[in-house]
Structure formats: structure tokens, C-alpha cells
Amino acid sequence: MTPRLFALIPCAGTGSRSGSAVPKQYRTLAGRALLHYTLAAFDACTEFAQTLVVLAPDDSHFDARRFAGLRFAVRRCGGGSRQASVLNGLLELAEFGATDHDWVLVHDAARPGITPELIRTLVATLKDDPVGGIVALPVADTLKRVPAGGDAIARTESRDALWQAQTPQMFRIGMLREAILRAQREGHDLTDEASAIEWAGHTPRVVQGSLRNFKVTYPEDFALAEAILARPANAS
């Protein structure tokens, strides 16, 4: 049987670094909620069996009317960290018929620049891979190491062979679940899915990402994201 595709959107964060009382995934950008752009990109990929949004149990900001017409499901099973929210979401996918052999693409709600084309490129590249992988970009900037709490440069780090991880991150549901469970048992709270897969001894691949697909994190990021989203994805 051909493995099916599922999308998982952890959306339980508060976005404290964004400088807003409203979680950043619900901020309005170019006329729509930031989360809308992620859901619309996956909705356009009709080959996906389901897109699952993981909310915090006490999320009072989510309003389904802002996402009318898009195909997705919601579960209020978010945990205290991204890793916990993703694990809880993976367990919920069984309710939609997902099996361990199926693929899941985990995507940050705060990356509204994702496009159906990038999603499909990732799937086409990795669908026959035994492990899976992520979209990422080669590091372009010069990297400086500064001690925690300080402002003096300790040294310049080589950027050779360094890539900046993005999402979606695509792995088999069973492999990812077991990798996260192992990380939890060993006391690690990892910041992305590839880290858990690596911790379990596997080797994920990288697929060329896009500058458009950056993560909205700081207050100044919203204006940049709005400018990008106001333009067609293929605009030069």
C-alpha cells in the first residue's frame, strides 16, 4: 500500500518573542491570520489525507471562522514544549487512519511563506527515502560565537557545510514518534523533528528551501512577512 501523507501543525506556542498579546499565529497579515497561509498551502495539496492543527488546551484565540473553507482538523492536545505538542499530535493522527508507515510533514505555524510547490518538492524528493528529511537553506551570513550574557566576540565560526533548518520536516510517523519518545526518556527536549531523528541514529536529508519560508519570530518580522505575502509566490 502506498504510504499516505499527513500534515501536522504545532500551534500551541504563545509567541512571547513577537512582542504581542495575541499569539503570532493569529496576527493579521495581508488581510488574513498568519496561520491561514500555512493551512491554505496544505489545503492546496489535495494529496494529503489530513492536516492536523495542535492547539494548547486553553487557547482562547483560535476562531475557526477565520479559516472557513480550508480542510483541516483541530485537537487541543498541545504540550509544554514543541516536542511534546508534536508527540501528542502524532498520537492523535491514528484517529484519522494514519499508520506508522505513513508520512507526516511537521510545519511551523509561524512560517506563512510556505507554498504548495515547496511542499510537493519535499515530498517528491523524499517519498522513497528510508528516513526522510527537511527543507533547509545553506547559511549565508558570517557566524560569530559570543559567550552567553556577553557581547564580546569569542571567535568566528566556519559556515562551511552549515544549513539553516526550516520546515516542513518529513518523516515516517512511527519512526518520528519512537525517536521523540527516546529523546524524552533520555531527558532531551529537542527543538525540531530532525534532531530527534538524528538522536535515534538516523540520517535525515536536506532539500533546498526558500527565503520566503522564514519563521516570523520578532516584531520587525511581521512587516517583512506582510510584504512577502502581498506578492505572488512566483513574483520576482
Curated annotation (Swiss-Prot):
EC number(s): the record gives 2.7.7.60
In the record, biological process GO terms are: isopentenyl diphosphate biosynthetic process, methylerythritol 4-phosphate pathway
Q: Domain of life here?
A: Bacteria
Provide the family line: Belongs to the IspD/TarI cytidylyltransferase family. IspD subfamily.
The answer, when asked if Metal-binding is one of the entry's keywords, is no
Tell me which UniProt keywords the record has, alphabetically: Isoprene biosynthesis, Nucleotidyltransferase, Transferase
Renumbered to this chain, the signal peptide range is none
This chain's function reads:
Catalyzes the formation of 4-diphosphocytidyl-2-C-methyl-D-erythritol from CTP and 2-C-methyl-D-erythritol 4-phosphate (MEP).
- One Pfam family, please name it: IspD
Pathway linked to the protein: Isoprenoid biosynthesis; isopentenyl diphosphate biosynthesis via DXP pathway; isopentenyl diphosphate from 1-deoxy-D-xylulose 5-phosphate: step 2/6
Report what the protein is called.
2-C-methyl-D-erythritol 4-phosphate cytidylyltransferase
Q: Which residues make up the annotated site Positions MEP for the nucleophilic attack?
A: 159, 215
Does the keyword section mention Nucleotidyltransferase?
A: yes
Record GO terms (molecular function): 2-C-methyl-D-erythritol 4-phosphate cytidylyltransferase activity
Main EC class the enzyme belongs to: transferase
Database matches in InterPro entries: IspD (IPR001228), IspD/TarI (IPR034683), IspD/TarI_cytidylyltransf_bact (IPR050088), ISPD_synthase_CS (IPR018294), Nucleotide-diphossugar_trans (IPR029044)
Enumerate the residues marked as the site Transition state stabilizer.
17, 24
Catalysed reaction(s) here are:
2-C-methyl-D-erythritol 4-phosphate + CTP + H(+) = 4-CDP-2-C-methyl-D-erythritol + diphosphate
